[in-house]
Amino acid sequence: MAETGDKPYRAEYAKSGRASCKKCGESIAKDSLRLALMVQSPMFDGKVPHWHHYSCFWKRARIVSHTDIDGFPELRWEDQEKIKKAIETGALQEEKGGTRKEVGKAEKSLTDFAAEYAKSNRSTCKGCEQKIEKGQIRISKKMVHPEKPQLGMIDNWYHPDCFVSRRAELGFLPAYGATQLLGFSILKAEDKETLKKQLPATKTEGKRKGEEVDGNVVAKKKSRKEKEKESKQEKQLKEQTELIWGIKDELRKVCSTNDLKELLIANKQEVPSGENAILDRVADGMAFGALLPCEECKGQFVFKSDAYYCSGDITAWTKCVAKTQTPNRKDWVIPKEFREIPYLKKFKCKKQDRIFPPEAATVNSAPPPPASAPLTETVTAPQDKPLTNMKILTLGKLSKNKEEVKNIVEELGGKMTTTANKATLCISTQKEVEKMSKKMEEVKDAKVRVVSEEFLKDVKSSNKGFQELLSLHAISPWGAEVKTEHQEVAVDGKCSKPANMKSAGKVKEEQGPSKSEKKMKLTVKGGAAVDPDSGLEDSAHVFEKGGKIFSATLGLVDIVKGTNSYYKLQLLEDDRESRYWVFRSWGRVGTVIGSNKLEQMPSKEDAVEHFLNLYEEKTGNSWHSKNFTKYPKKFYPLEIDYGQDEEAVRKLTVSAGTKSKLAKPIQDLIKMIFDVESMKKAMVEFEIDLQKMPLGKLSKRQIQSAYSILNEVQQAVSDGGSESQILDLSNRFYTLIPHDFGMKKPPLLSNLEYIQAKVQMLDNLLDIEVAYSLLRGGNEDGDKDPIDINYEKLRTDIKVVDKDSEEAKIIKQYVKNTHAATHNAYDLKVVEIFRIEREGESQRYKPFKQLHNRQLLWHGSRTTNFAGILSQGLRIAPPEAPVTGYMFGKGIYFADMVSKSANYCHTSQADPIGLILLGEVALGNMYELKNASHITKLPKGKHSVKGLGKTAPDPTATTTLDGVEVPLGNGISTGINDTCLLYNEYIVYDVAQVNLKYLLKLKFNYKTSLW
């Protein structure tokens, strides 16, 4: 059962007469029964009730079960029965005079279901996502969209067969029939007969066992014992409801609100806000006993429809998730001063458990449930189906019919679509690609990769990686990189190492489809950018006093509630006059949900005071406080802003290359390393919210704090920590590193693979932070080209190697010979070879120069990481990072097979150029291992670790270059079969054991065709 906050409806008695019905617009009388649709507010990150008169409500919604209604058990018994009857029959109407009448089921049209002939071929079936052709019969389920309630009831169209297969899910009860569809009467006679057969009205209790309605099993006739049990439960629930309402009615007569508060205080119960809530708490205590505090957090339990929920907090970051139907209680005390009231004097409290109705399995009612799913349904990690979250389009004649293809796609976790710009992949034939029909042109324009039908067969049964299969079966020269939620596993299935550990053998896939970057033009003045939503970006600047900029971005994440909120606050000062404004904006991260407010203040003093008050109200802290303290349900300040140095970075990149003194290949390399768009693209792939976390303020301290949280959560998951602990750490992590999940609930960090994916994300963010810091740092030199300025910041001497030289021939042979057989999705072409010498690195390496067993080995990384690598060297993960994120512990990893390291360049067909390093590595005595081992300290006498692979370069072909071994032989079997690794890995734990020698620019030629 969904937690109450996730229920799509609410019922209560109107607290006042101020609310208006969203259907008829008339006011809802105080104390009358009202029902609400819970919809996403367009103004803030949360849901709001759209209240209706009881009679109006049924014209806008069709409820499948009363368990979908928050507040249902708190209604009077007769109103509970009235709602149940309306749900069962769908036939209760209320006339204007207030009288009620029953309408025959066959006579009454269902206002939220309709049938008609498609007016065009533009509509798409919500079931199969195929087009509904013009003139075809289509059936609509009308719904209020939770994110766009202002549009009212919207048609969601289905093919008749698709509607029938989802009958129960869409709330078309067995008691309903085709004749009740709006528009049924004007259909053709033969179509009416067909629909009647497909959607018959059937009683819920048939004479035959297992009776079915188009595949939907109707409830079997209940046994006598079941009926007696239900009757007994109903009787108990009725008596309980009447007891509670009897207490409430009497208390209203004899006690004031202050009296009720005193009763709660006397029984050590929290006093809630609102007269009705106070009355409910007192009535519950008098009926069942005073509630004892939550054992986990000492918070107050509160009744909410299906259980008692703790309202306390585990920590300042996380709400307590304890809930129970049998909370501990003590006797309810009536203080002496209240015994003068006859009713309270004679009242005797009997300590007992509250009775709850048996949980009913609910189906999705309309409107659809909120985007935030219950905690138990939260997607915490990538799914094990390879096509999860993908939409597949088919074009042309395939060997299997559309229904067979659809079944295979759905079995693999995907869905079908008919729209090119919604598709993740297109399945077609080489003939169709060559023919280039109008539909195929749409596919090309949408940059959707086309694969052959064999892809479906292989992705289901092959041991090859997903990206490898994509490249193998691709039949179009175009196509963006396809991101998958499926994680690759070792080919032989024996390796216990997750695919995304820092072992260069597998390509780690990011989660879900990439989100398009959100762009906002920022006007930077002085210390910070003025938020353009204020409308004052051209005439005002952010106020500054005592070196402190009066601008704050705050975050609040609550995974249980599905909250992912931001709050921005700025004090603005006019550029010319003595005028001041306080601007604030708020909403949900990564969506258009939210609003803002601009207030002009009478004076500077008033503006400052208002800013300080708002900051304290939202965070619980003083603006001038040096040590921030996080408080429950309060926002946390993020160490970011809009990026004060954006303009400086723009100047450095806009005219790059016009007067550079560097060789052209080196110029191109520097442009590639410092490409801001590539950095932004990488961040978007990581689901980072670029509006709240721009490149300019990825502070190292913030990233290190995030590492610490991942370390804690990894430990908690490994040790079987409590749900509350994992929730708390997840909330802290997503607050610190704002993520754009759209309307989805932030996923729990409850899976080791997902945690390790986030570790890798932070590894990359650290290097991006270094690159951007270099870009914006230092002084401008009008005589120097921006490329030359950036080159100098790397503090690395870079020379182009002549491709006909002996060293170039050896390196190219090394690339050619050590391309692993299983990495056959692409070929590698050497575009450029650069000899590199990092400032001070050879001096640091000197003590290891005499160590035996020095080899020239490969190390691959994203292009966005190379500014950090060249300026600071290859680094070991910080102490804060979890050790289990790396197969052999925290070290620097190398390979002797080029493609093993090349997989870490994260190239794609759309972006096929990558960078890879060759480093001289002092290995000395190697500690040889066959399986994962989280090394924190090497055994005595060992200088490095070698992860033994099944295939390695032929040792007889090893050559030397400047006295260093180059293992450039062709890959052959090592004869080691009981190992986790396909290929060798080399790890050193001291950065001084590495001396980087070469940097290669490689082109990844992806195999796009079988022919």
Swiss-Prot record:
Regions of compositional bias (Basic and acidic residues) in chain numbering: 225-235, 506-519
Segments forming domain PARP catalytic: 785-1011
Active site: E985 (for poly [adp-ribose] polymerase activity)
Residues where Zn(2+) 3 binds: C294, C297, C310, C320
The keyword Transmembrane helix appears for this protein: no
Start-end of PARP-type zinc fingers: 9-91, 113-203
Region (Disordered), start-end ranges: 198-235, 359-378, 496-519
Motif, Nuclear localization signal: chain positions: 207-209, 220-225
One term of GO molecular function: damaged DNA binding
Binding-site positions, Zn(2+) 2: C125, C128, H159, C162
EC number: 2.4.2.30, 2.4.2.-
The protein, known as: Poly [ADP-ribose] polymerase 1
Species of origin: Gallus gallus
Classification lineage: Eukaryota, Metazoa, Chordata, Craniata, Vertebrata
Gene: PARP1
